[in-house]
């Protein structure tokens, strides 16, 4: 997810909503961390710099199929307008990237069509299953697509601008 984190905030993860159950984990270092990918471990992940962070946790079965390999990646959020209203379907285009000012992410003025938004997870178009990081705004709330099918169409007109506030999981189209 995309979160605003203050310097020295600490994160830990769990498979349950409880510290008493599940599999609690952090990373393998006590040092404050900047953007990067870190191996799972027992230490809290301490954030080095304040700002918005895209936090992605991956858990994969080890090659010997005996353990779960955990990793935590932290990066700068990169949010885009895609499809007919923005950059199309073939490559990430910086002209269609949202800009963050004062905690709000703002899009460039969109083209007419059905709005589709995504979070860029890797540097290669298509390598990140960008469709799984798609989201849209419904009734003023940000809703992610996840592994489901296409979301309900959100029609927009030429020149409208999308604003997103991930602190409140809200957005608007004006």
Q: Model-predicted segments: where are they?
A:
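Insoluble glucan recognition modules
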Residues: 1-174
């Amino acid at each position: 997810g995309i979160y605003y984190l203050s310097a020295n905030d600490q994160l830990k993860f769990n498979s349950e909503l409880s510290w008493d159950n599940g599999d609690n984990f952090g990373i393998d270092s006590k040092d404050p961390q900047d953007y990067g990918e870190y191996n799972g471990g027992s230490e809290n992940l301490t954030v080095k710099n304040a700002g918005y962070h895209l936090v992605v946790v991956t858990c994969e079965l080890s090659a010997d199929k005996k353990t779960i390999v955990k990793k935590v990646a932290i990066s700068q959020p990169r949010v885009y307008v895609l499809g007919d209203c923005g950059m199309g379907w073939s490559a990430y285009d910086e002209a269609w990237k949202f800009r963050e000012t004062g905690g709000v992410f703002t899009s460039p003025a969109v083209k007419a069509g059905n709005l589709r938004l995504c979070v860029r997870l890797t540097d290669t178009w298509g390598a990140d299953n960008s469709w799984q990081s798609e989201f849209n705004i419904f009734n003023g709330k940000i809703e992610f697509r996840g592994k489901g099918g296409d979301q309900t169409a959100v029609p927009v007109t030429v020149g409208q601008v999308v604003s997103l506030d991930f602190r409140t999981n809200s957005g608007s189209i004006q």
